[in-house]
Amino acid sequence: MKVTVERAQLLKSLGHVHRVVERRNTIPILGNVLVRAESTRLSLKATDLDLEVTETLAAEAATAGSTTVPAHMFYDIVRKLPEGAQIVLEGDGDRSVLAIRAGRSRFTLQTLPENDFPDLAAGEMTHSFTLAAADMKRLIDRTQFAISTEETRYYLNGIYLHSAGTAKAATLRAVATDGHRLAQIDLTLPKGAVGMPGVIVPRKTVGEVQRLIEDNEAEVGIELSQGKIRFTIGNVVLTSKLIDGTFPDYGRVIPQNNDKELIVDKKDFEAAVDRVSTISSERGRAVKLALSPGKLVLSVTNPDSGSATEELEVEYASDPLDIGFNSRYLLDIAAQIEGEVAVLKLADPGSPTLVQDKDSKGALYVLMPMRV
C-alpha cells in the first residue's frame, strides 16, 4: 500500500473515527484503525464492537492495500505534522509496519493484520429515511441531557426513537429519562419511518452522531432494524448496536391534569435559579419555588453557608404553592427552552411538573419535585 493524502483532510477524518477507540483495550486490534487505500480514496474504520465509524476521503493511491495501526498514536502523529503537509503512507507487509512521511518527518508504526479487524455486520435494515441535519441535531440536543448514566438501568442509557401520534399527525419522537426528569421531542414523521420499530440508541452513539452533525449541514441518512442503526452523514457512516431492552411506558409519568400554570420569562428564570443555587450544597442542590398570584420567590437554604432568595414577577393566578426541585435539573430543562417564555404546569408539592416552551409545541419536559 502506498497513498498520498492532505494532512488537513486526514486529521479531520481521524478526529472522527479515533474517538470510538477506547484508550485501554484487552483486545489489541480494537486499539487500531483500519486504513484502506483504493485508487482515488482512503477509508478509515474504527470500532469498539458496539459502534463502528467509517469515513472516506480523497487521496492518491499509487498502490492499493490495507492495514491497521494504533488509532490514537496515528492521530497524534498527524496532528503534530505541519499544516499544509502532504502525507505519504506506505505499508511494508514483510516488516508489519506502516511508514508515515511528511516533509522531513519520518515515522513507522507497528501494524496488526487486517484479517483480525472485526466487522460490525449490519445485516438487513428494515427502515430507511432521511432527516435534515438541523432536525437530527435538535432531537439529540433537546433530549441528551436526560439520558440516565446508571448502568444498572441500562434500558435508560440512551434515547428512545420511535413513531408516535395518529395516522393524520404521525411523529418521529425522541424520549430520554433518568427517572428524575424526562425530555420528549417530536418531529413530523419522515417518509420511510412509517411502522419503524421503537429503538433505544446508546448514549455513546448519540454523542458521536451529535459531534458529526456539528461538522455537517446537509442531511442525515438513517437506516435501522431491531438490532442495529446506521447513520450516514456526508462521507461518514456510523453503525451501532441498539440497547437490547424495553423502554418504560413513559406516557404514564407525563402529567395530563396539572391545573396550576406558571408563565415566566425564560432568561430571567434561568438566571435567578442560577444565582440562588450558588449557595446550595453539591449534595442537596434543592431550590424552593414559592408561588402566589403574580409572584414567584426562589429560595435556597444551606445550613453550612447561609441562604439566598430572589423574587420574580410572573403570570400565575392559582392558589399559593410551595414546591422544590433539584436546581441543576431545573437549569438543564430551562436551557432547552428555545423561545423567550417558559410554561410550567404544576399540581402539588409531590407530583411531577410539566415544562414547555410557549412558542414550541413539539417539545415537553417533566421534572420530579424534591422535598424542601
What feature does the model see in each segment?
Residues 1-372:
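Structural preference for solvent-exposed beta-strand-turn elements
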